[in-house]
Structures are given as structure tokens and as C-alpha cells.
Amino acid sequence: MLVALVVSSVTCLGVILTSIFNVRFEIKGKTFHVYWMVALLGALIVLFSSLSLSEWWQVLTKSGGINPIKILVLFLSMSLISIFLDELGFFAHLANWTMLRFKKNQISLFVTLYIFVSLLTMFTSNDIIILTLTPFILFFCKNAKISPIPYLVSEFIAANTWSMIFIIGNPTNIYLASSFNIAFTEYFKVMAIPTLLTGLVEFLILFLIFMGKLKDPIQPNPLKLEKENRPLTILGLSVLGICTILLVLSGYFALPMYLISAVSLGALVLLSLIYFICTRTKPSVVGHTLRRAPYEIIPFVIGMFTLVLALEKYGVTQNIANFFGSSGTTFVYGLTSAFSANLINNIPMSVLYSSICNFSSENIRLRAIYSSIIGSNIGAFLSPLGALAGIMWLSILKKYDVKFSYLDFVKYGCTVGVPSLLVALSSLLLFI
């Protein structure tokens, strides 16, 4: 037990430090982040000292219910469909059209961007939306000669709030909900109102914070974008739409969500290749899409899952569940999960809390799960470490010479995040 506890603690500390300082290196122009290597190294040490390969493999690939591999398939498939649309320029064209459509003043632009990001993140991955739209916002604000800070902060917060409404909005939703066989529609019925109320409250807070900056005049200049490939864009949107509908219906027909997303991605790739063959053009979009996939999440999730498995084996997660008790479940699990996400990142936190919830009393388990899901989403904007997107988001801002420090992130994030978290958890009490 001691070995598993020490290795897990040191690994989490290593993940925190390498994430905060964005430790990475390059080999032949390819950038490699170190955080996932730390997680993988810790997992290997635990695997050869505290776990047997057979029990590790059995849990990793269990046929009944959900397992880490199925969750990774679901997340990567949905991410790749979103990246495919991004490679075609769909998000950039849509954002450009939206911003120019409401170009009279910054207030209408601010409202439009918030709604735009909120809608997109519901049906795609919040991380993909953040990483896709951030460079566009920076370019647009530079051309319009306005401060990008109000739009960048609202984009990040909106993406990590409205991602709560559907299971597919965030890999943490996928992991926690799927681990307890919560269906798509069942999840939506519980999370719809808390997400809506939280989104409205945080928008009001954001508006009050940035109201002064939004009074400056705007001088919009259309960005020069490459011509959109209409047939492939229609194909990508059709696949995404059909996939989303099937995910909604999956609970009624006992269709595995990971299988729906994987088949959808396979169909998209196959039909795209047929299109390229028929038009005698290079399938560069497919290649670029596959290269941009967040593959680093695979060793990271499996590594952190291995650490949690060791902690579970030696009763650590059960002791935490016993310590939490059965009173004040919503706020205990919600607040501690949000805090934990900023210590070890929200994906490992979800793996940890999945095990803790599993040991909670049956009469409070659902409340604990949904509270942890809320904490995993809103906790992402309390500090950059809360989510992988936060770390990458800050690195993009540094690349474009935007002055926005770690403390700035915490200041804005906590100002909006703390009341948002309280509203979300309070409204959850109405449904569970």
C-alpha cells in the first residue's frame, strides 16, 4: 500500500509541475509534452510493484459495461470528427460570418461569441473548440484593434460550462457517466437545467467584469480565409449530426456509445477517401486530421487509471469515500472534485472520483457522480492546471504575445468559477 501511495503522490506532483511549467521537448520538429510521460512512468512503477499484469489487463479490457479503452475510443472518435471539420475551415468560416454579422459594437459581438461557443461545445469537444477558436479570436481582435481578453476568457469559460449538458461535451463526462452506465438521455435530463442556470449566471458575471472594455469602438476587417470545401463540409456535418442522434437514442436500443462514435468516424474517413478518389485529389484533410488527434491522452489516461487501480486495490479510495460520508454529498463531492482537478488535472481526477463514487453508499451514488461531473467541468477554469486545454490555451496566448499570466487566469477563473460552481451544485439538488 505504501509504495502505491508514494508513487501515486509523486506522480501527481510531477504531472502538476510539468503541466504548470509546460515542460516539453522537440524531436525533428515534433513537440512532445512531458506530463503524460510522468503519468506513464508512475503507472509502470506501480504495475511492476503493486499490481499484477493479469488483474490490470482484466480491468482495462473488461467486456461488461465501460472500460478506459472504450472511453478513449469515444473521446478520440468525437475529437477527430471535430478536427476534420476544423481542417476544412468550417469553424473559422462560421466564426468569421457570425462576428461580421453582429459587428455593430463589442457588446453584441461579446454576446454572439458566448452563444456561438456554447452551442458548438454542446455537440463537439470543448477542448477542440477552445484550441480551434482561440487563434481566430486573436487574429480577429488584432484586426479590429480591440482587447482580446474579454473574448478569450468568455470563450474558455463558456466551453467548460456548456460542455456539462451532454455526455460527449467533455471526456470527464464520458468517463464518469459511462463508468456507471448512465444513458445519454438520462444524463441530459439531470444536467440540462443546472447547465442552463450556471451558464446564465456566469454570463452576467462576465458581462459585469468586462463591461468597461466592451464600450470601446470596433473596426472589423474580414479575415482572408481559404475557400471552404462544401461537399466534405456537408459530409462532416452530416456524420456529426447522425452520430449525435444515435448517441441520444443509444440508451433506448442498447447501442454502445463508443461503437457508435467509432463507426461514425470510420464512415467519415471511408467516404472522404472515396470523394478524393473520385475527384482525383490528395486526401490531405484526412492526413492532417489524423495527425492532429490528441494521442497523448491515451498514455495519460491509462497511466492515471493504473495509479487509481492500485489505490483502489489497497483501499485508499474506499477510505476517502468513507471519510466523505453520506451527508452534504452534492457539495462535498462537487467542491472537492473541482479542487482536486486543479491538483492533478480533471481527467485523472475523474478516474479517481469514479472509484470513490463506486465505494459511496448506493443511496447517494448518483448525486456523487453528477456532483463530480460538475466539479470536473467548472474546476477547469479555476486554474490552468484544471484541464489540458487550459495549459495549451495559455501556451497559445504566449505564442501570440498576449499578456495573460497564470495569476490572471486564476483571478478571472475564480471570480466566475466559484459562484458558478455553487449555482450548479445548488440547482442539481432539485433533480437528485
Where are these regions (language model features)?
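Hydrophobic transmembrane alpha-helices of multi-pass small-molecule transporters
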Residues: 1-83, 87, 193-199, 203-313, ...
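Hydrophobic alpha-helical transmembrane segments
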Residues: 7-22, 52-57, 103, 132-148, ...
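Membrane-embedded alpha-helical segments and adjacent helix-loop junctions characteristic
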Residues: 56-146, 296-361
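Helix-loop-helix module between adjacent transmembrane segments
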Residues: 78-86, 104-105, 116-126, 158-166, ...
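Re-entrant/interfacial helical elements at transmembrane boundaries that shape
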Residues: 94, 128-139, 152, 166-180, ...
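Residue-level recognition of transmembrane alpha-helices
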Residues: 114, 135, 155-156, 169, ...
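Membrane-core helix-loop-helix motifs of multi-pass transport proteins
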Residues: 140, 144-231, 364, 392-426
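C-terminal transmembrane helix pair
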Residues: 188-198, 330-432
